[in-house]
Each structure stands twice: as C-alpha cells, then as structure tokens.
Amino acid sequence: MSKKIIECGLSQKSIQDAIDQLKVYQTELNNKNELFVKRLSELGLEVVQTTMESIPDEEKGSYYTEIIYDKQGNIIGSSIRLSGNNVLFIEFSAGITYGTNDYPLPSGNSYGMGTYPSKKEKSDWDNPNGWWYTDESGQSHHSYGNRAYMPMYHAEQAIVIAVRKIAKEVFG
C-alpha cells in the first residue's frame, strides 16, 4: 500500500475526520491482508494439488485440500489432509534406491535421498537392486522404496518465489 497521509487540525470536526479516515484505512488494510493470505494459500494449494495428481494412486492414498476461514469469514490459512499407509513417504520418501537430487533447506542443510541418519555405517538406500522387508504377517516383499514427491516443499518454494510479487499486486 502506498504511504497514506492523514492531516488534521485541532478542531473537534478535524479530529473526527482523521479518526474516520483511519477507520477506512484500517478496513482497507484488513481487506488487503485477507486477499494477500488468500492468494498465497491458493498458490500453495494449487502446487500441492498438481504435485498430488502426479503421484501414482497406489502411493498417494487419498487427500483433501481446503482454505480455512474464521467465524467472520476471514481466511486464516489452508489445510491438506492425507490418509493412507504411505502418506509420510509422499513428503520425505522411504528407502529410495534410485537417484533424485537433494533439496536445500533454509538453514543451508539439505534433505533428500540418504540424508536421514542411519545407525549403520552403510544403509541400503543406495542399493540399485532395491531391498527386501518383512511385513507384519511374515511375508517378504521387494522394494525400490518410495520417492519423495514433496508437495509441501514445492508449495513453500512457490510461495517464497511469489510472495513479493503478490504483495506488490495486493498492496500496490
């Protein structure tokens, strides 16, 4: 928003006019803040939905996205609800044995394939032949792991890239 100057004299009417102008400005600022949060939420949800739709059905389970409103109808955030056996792996992966790049974190560290600490000197995450595990019933299964699709990471990156542009569009 551009700089707003409100001038007033010392008369009662002038002070009341300044108060009225401040109330209008407060309403405008609240409306713009709501639009700003809505635009960022919509962008994040769009990226999450696009990422989720790219995931094979057997890996993603089901998901639901929504924009969250308070009792007055103001947008206060967005929500993504996942259900299924492998939902954590959608963001973080598990036992992946094929190459993907690491992703940088704001702290300067990275996460990605093989970055989770293991108690063994060498984990199985980089075995090109995959690995075997035994399920609860004692049945052995072969796996190449679950890829990290990272819908939340990609949504965060899209928001970080667009936040200044959207702020300029909304606040002028």
List where the protein language model places each region.
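Short amphipathic alpha-helical segments with heptad-repeat character
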Residues: 23, 27-34, 38, 153
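Amphipathic alpha-helical hairpins
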Residues: 24, 28, 53, 57-58
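N-terminal, Lys/Arg- and Ser/Thr-rich interaction peptides
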Residues: 1-28
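Charged, low-complexity interaction tracts
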Residues: 2-7, 57-172
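Generic alpha-helical secondary structure signal
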Residues: 13-16, 20, 35, 153, ...
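Non-globular disordered terminal and juxtamembrane segments underlying protein topogenesis/assembly
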Residues: 33-51, 163
